[in-house]
Every structure is written in structure tokens, then in C-alpha cells.
Amino acid sequence: EREQVSNLYLVPTLYHMLIEHPAFARERVASVEKIGFAGAPMSDGLMRRVEQAFQPQLFVNHYGSSEIYTFTIDQQASRKPGSSGRSALNQRVRVVPIDAESAQVQVKPMEEGQIVADLASDEAFEGYLNRSEATAKALREGWYFTGDTGYFDEDGDLFVTGRVDDLIITGGENISPVEIENVLSLHPAVEEVVVVGLPDEQWGKIIAAFIKLRAEVSESELDAYCITSGLAKFKRPRRYQFIDEIPKSPVGKVLRRVLLAQHQEQAQKG
């Protein structure tokens, strides 16, 4: 407000902290015209609230990594929530089968797979220092295997759905936590949500939602909301756990394994 900042480039967690702060007001950020985010996906619910709070001229989703700074960019992120846009300048991105060893076979539009990026980009790294096994796993035939999951829609826009390691396999189905998180994040009583898989003897994993609330809501109400939102039955959470805080790294990334370690026993008891 004092400095009349016109551009913001933050991780989603910092946008959440800003707009949820008691002192936040639209008039205090009226000078901000352009905003961007990177470092983690922004849920549909948070994106809607950020759009309403800042009403920016430009809303950029910058998808990249430390290994290759930019994969794709969407300069109007809120027009299609979840979209990471198209390949950046001098970059090529593909989606290949989850367990692919080569980048030559690509999946069809709307089919989820692993995201890979061309190493010919000027922003690309050459490998991990003194980590030959990690380099061999990530770099194959001139492509960087990101470990991220996603898909291209029919328009050619990339959607990042999570990490290969975070996929929940339940009853033989691969389920992305992000899809479920996006649905629940739009419920007015939900402030933040993280979806994980809990071990289960029958299903392998069951879907559990850890939720920080902004208002009272019951598990049955949330389940009904998932139904009306069109979420398939096998993707709906079997457990809901209401918690005070969601653990995050210093840069705002959700620490799913820390969350599981903190709450797994209680969540499994239901």
C-alpha cells in the first residue's frame, strides 16, 4: 500500500496468507495490476478468491522447476482454473505414460501421464551434481522427466495434477489428489484442503481429506457437495479429518508426508 506495488509474484500460500489476513482490504492493494504464481498449484477455490481480491489485469501461472526454470505459462490463469497454459519460448513439453522409459510415446488429450520437458531449452540444467543415479533417472534421450503428473486438454493447454509419488491407487484406479482438492476447495466452509491416501487392507489405499475450516460443516455435507459437484463415487473421500493447520515448507509447499505422520493414526481410526 505504502510503496504502491504494481506487480506481485508469489507462491500460492503467500496469496492465501495475504487475503486471509484480518487487515486485508481491496483498497489496500488497488495499485496491483499484474499477479503471478509459481512453486505449487493453486486450488480452484483459492484462485477464485485471489481473482476477486485483486481483480488483476494479468494473472499468470508460471509452471517450471529448479531444473528447468520454465515449462509452460498461462497469462490468463483464472479463465481456465488449473491450466498451466502452453509451452514457453524455446521449450517443448509432452505428457507420456506414467511408467514410460522414453518420451517418444505420448498419451492422448485428457489422458493423465507424466510431464516431460525438452532439455534443449536455454534454461535447462545438465544434471545433478555428484548424483549420477538421480541424473540417469531424470534425464532420458534429451528429455527431463519431471515426476509431475498432468494432461493436455483438447485446446492444448497443460493441466498439472500432482506428483507421480502422490498418486493414490485405490481399487486399481490411479487417482490424482488435486482433482479432489479442487472440488472441496470451492466449498465456502473450506479454507484449505489436502487429500492423501491411507493404507487399507481391502482397497490398497483409501482417500482421506485433511481440511482446515473457515466455518462449521459436517462430513456428510462435504460428501453431498462432492456428489453435486460431479465427483465420481470412487474419487470421493472415505475419511474427513478437520485440523488446525496444514504443514508447509518455508516456500509454501504442502508437506504431505509430515501431515500423514502427524495425523495418520487418528485418520485411520475414522
Which residue stretches match the model-derived regions?
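Core-facing hydrophobic residues within beta-strands of well-ordered domains
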Residues: 29-32, 190, 237
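Hydrophobic/anchoring residues in structured secondary elements
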Residues: 37, 195, 239-242
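AMP-binding/adenylate-forming catalytic core of the ANL superfamily
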Residues: 8-11, 93, 119-121, 126-127, ...
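Active-site phosphate/pyrophosphate- and oxyanion-stabilizing loops and adjacent acidic/basic residues
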Residues: 16, 48, 82, 133, ...
